[in-house]
């Protein structure tokens, strides 16, 4: 009987790990809650609950929103760099080396093309979100857990020890 109790506990734990809350397209996941997003240039100062809405605060001048909760100081380009884009409340300053044609910042790929009059054109491509990857990974872990649970139950009921002590095991063993 102890293996069955342990197996049930294991299944409950796997179910808890495998269940992920999926928010609607117009919501963001904050902890275990799905909340409406903050406005542009604002950070989360208090997470929503079932009874209250999310509380947002604008980032002060000279900072930009970094993630959902933080305002980060804007980067200052140094003397060996050229400023490509000014810092705003939603995006950091984009700096590039004066003599290079390619550069990158985390999560964003940039390509700078110099023309004869030394103006720059930038193409920006955002990185992909990891939310779908997390959902698929959770589903995979859940399914592997269920398969292991089924295999364990079959092995337990087929064992001689279980057949001798459990009438259910004898019935189950005969049907397989």
UniProtKB/Swiss-Prot annotation:
Residues 1-20 form the signal peptide. One of its GO terms (cellular component) is membrane. It is a single-pass membrane protein. The chain crosses the membrane at residues 134-154. This is Membrane glycoprotein UL144. Activates NF-kappaB in a tumor necrosis factor receptor (TNFR)-associated factor 6 (TRAF6)-dependent manner, causing the up-regulation of the chemokine CCL22. It is found in: Membrane.
């Amino acid at each position: 009987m102890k293996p069955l109790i342990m197996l049930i506990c294991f299944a409950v734990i796997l179910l808890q790990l495998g269940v992920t809350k999926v928010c609607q397209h117009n919501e963001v996941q904050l902890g275990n809650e799905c909340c409406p997003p903050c406005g542009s240039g604002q950070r989360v100062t208090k997470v929503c609950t079932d009874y209250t809405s999310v509380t947002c605060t604008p980032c002060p001048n000279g900072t930009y929103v970094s993630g959902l909760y933080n305002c980060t100081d804007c980067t200052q380009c140094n003397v060996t760099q050229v400023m490509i884009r000014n810092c705003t409340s939603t995006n950091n300053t984009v700096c590039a080396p004066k003599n290079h044609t390619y550069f990158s910042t985390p999560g964003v790929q940039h390509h700078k093309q110099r023309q004869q009059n030394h103006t720059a054109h930038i193409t920006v491509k955002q990185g992909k979100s990891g939310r779908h990857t997390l959902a698929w990974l959770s589903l995979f872990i859940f399914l592997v857990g269920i398969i292991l649970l089924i295999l364990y139950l079959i092995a337990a009921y087929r064992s001689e020890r279980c057949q001798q002590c459990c009438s259910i095991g004898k019935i189950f063993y005969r049907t397989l």
